[in-house]
Amino acid sequence: MEALGKYFIFLGKLFVNRETFGTYFKLIIDECVAIGINSIFLVSLVSFFMGAVTTIQTAYNLVSPLIPDYVISLVVRDMTILELAPTIIGVIYAGKVGSSMASGLGTMRISEQIDALEVMGINSTSYLVLPKILGSLLMYPLLVILAGLLSIVGGYLAGEFTGVITPTEYIYGIRFEFNEYMVTFALIKSFVFAFLVASISSFKGYYTTGGAVEVGKASTAAVTQSVIAILTADYLLAQLLLQ
């Protein structure tokens, strides 16, 4: 409970004694590049093969002649939008971006760079962490959209090359009884996950004490706690918004 209270106090400090908009704008752009642009390749690779594997495994399990082939792509669509794109990519995001945030801030803490900012009268929490959270909120939903699209494309190509489903049937299943709310739900999850990963990772890195070993431990703890938070939020959001 003490750590939880410290976390909420940490979040409250983000909005105290803030810098000018121009200062934040440059920092946010830098974070968007580090968080989003540098993650595109990994997200694209994982998403493409995630869709391909999901298509093949779904086709393997749906062997009944009573089940039409388009159900394969329907299952891929729903699994991708509702769960795989936001949640699986969220776990990868925590491992790549979250650990980077924690180790970066942890290194600044043990090298006394954060203390130097405080001495100069700068709110180090707001200056260092707020751009990371805003950059994460801007870029992670875009990564989720990219992941969803590439998963569906990966499933399409896997179905065509393996012959488990024809392109016509695949596209029909993707469009069959499509519910736009699934996209809304996925985007809501993406914003929540983006905030959790950025804030928890920054929190663990910001309060690092000791030396290089502790920075590594903080980075590991940031990833672990971010993944736990993602899975917990995933369940709660599904319970609240899909009833």
Task: Give the residues covered by each predicted segment.
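Short, membrane-interfacial amphipathic segments enriched in basic
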Residues: 1-26, 204, 209
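Membrane-interface helix starts
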Residues: 20-45
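Membrane-interfacial helix-loop-helix connectors in multipass membrane proteins
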Residues: 57-81, 148-191, 199-218, 240-243
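Short cytoplasmic-facing helical segments at TM-TM junctions of multi-pass membrane proteins
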Residues: 105-130, 212-215
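Hydrophobic alpha-helical transmembrane segments of multipass membrane transporters and ion channels
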Residues: 37-49, 85-90, 138-147, 184, ...
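Active-site cofactor/substrate anionic-group-binding motifs, chiefly glycine-
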Residues: 36-88, 92
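Hydrophobic alpha-helical transmembrane segments of multi-pass membrane transport proteins
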Residues: 72-115, 200
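Start (N-cap) of specific transmembrane helices in multi-pass transporter permeases
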Residues: 123-144, 218
